Amino acid sequence: IRCFAKFVYDNEIVKKNEFSVETDAGIKYIKLDIGALGAIEYLKVNMEKVDFKGKNIPCTIEKENILEEEIMIGNKKVIFSSVLMGVPHATIFVENFDEYDVNETGSLMEKVDIFPEKTNVNFAKVTADDTIMIKTWERGAGRTLGCGTGCCATAALAHKLGKIKKDKIKLLAEGGELFIEIGEDYEITMSGKAETICHGEFLK
């Protein structure tokens, strides 16, 4: 969503620094921090509320919330928590990332039958009282260097489980950092940068 917002602003499709984007996961409200030279320095997105209800994720475990549940993935026991952040997310909190092969465990868990619509899988390590390192396996796409909804879901779960008590949390993904603010009833605001890395043209 941040990359899309940057694209439409940079290409003058949208000329205001505040606008909304209608997505399959609802309407997202964007605010751009524009620098002195007219370039975007930061983007803030209202991601709406996290949905903790298991039936809405959807997850077939018959509990109100899917928090710190245990499942066997391959031959390894996995403890995970899950929410709907526009799309399904399962987060595994680890002490060290070498506890799991992110690609193997992520691929298997994406398709496990308790998630009838499949799930994104996040591996998260709390490194400070306001900081989380995260690696993400995205459903249908595989390993990704960054996932905005995954960062939002993981920050909300860390807060809900008491792993982090602060309302402003830094997420360190492999592709960069995001800042997540947790508001009333777990309404989430995501802030971060977006950078253009290349331009291309489709030829007929």
Q: What are the functions of these language-model segments?
A:
Residues 2-145, 155-204:
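Active-site proximal loop and beta-alpha junction motif in alpha/beta enzyme cores
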